[in-house]
């Protein structure tokens, strides 16, 4: 659909083989930009001081849909990290972030990566149960490993 081969391959990975989502990524450039923004935020938050994390959690929690999207994006990233820590040869979802995923995986153990993935999955479930979004975001970000 007018997409070069390299970008099509990237979109196929990011969409996880879901054609509808891949089409939305092609049609709506802001979706892809938002993903990049959230992954850049993740990278900036890992070494960030607590005050920065609290401030980010406050902003994030103001829009529940945006928060859910951010957590979903972060979950795909942390799953990639966990797979690399475990030494799995499974293809990454976030192939465009391979270098930083490898870097992070080299600094974490499997139990830490697994805990972050589990925390993100639990956060999505808790959002469905209407828990306090700000508190949820704060706990989530404070529990991330400081790298």
Task: List each model region and its residues.
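Charged, glycine-rich active-site and insertion segments that engage polyanionic ligands
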Residues: 1-73, 77-78, 84-93, 97-147
């Amino acid at each position: 659909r007018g997409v070069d081969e390299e970008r099509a391959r990237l979109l196929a990975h990011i969409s996880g083989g879901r054609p509808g989502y891949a089409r939305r990524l092609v049609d709506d450039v802001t979706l892809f930009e938002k993903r990049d923004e959230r992954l850049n935020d993740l990278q900036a938050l890992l070494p960030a001081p607590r005050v920065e994390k609290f401030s980010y959690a406050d902003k994030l929690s103001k829009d529940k849909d945006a928060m859910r999207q951010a957590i979903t994006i972060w979950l795909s990233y942390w799953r990639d990290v966990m797979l690399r820590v475990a030494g799995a040869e499974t293809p990454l979802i976030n192939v465009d972030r391979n270098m930083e995923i490898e870097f992070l995986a080299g600094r974490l153990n499997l139990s830490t990566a697994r805990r972050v993935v589990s925390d993100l999955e639990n956060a999505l479930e808790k959002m469905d149960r209407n828990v306090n979004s700000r508190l949820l975001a704060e706990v989530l970000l404070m529990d991330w490993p400081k790298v």
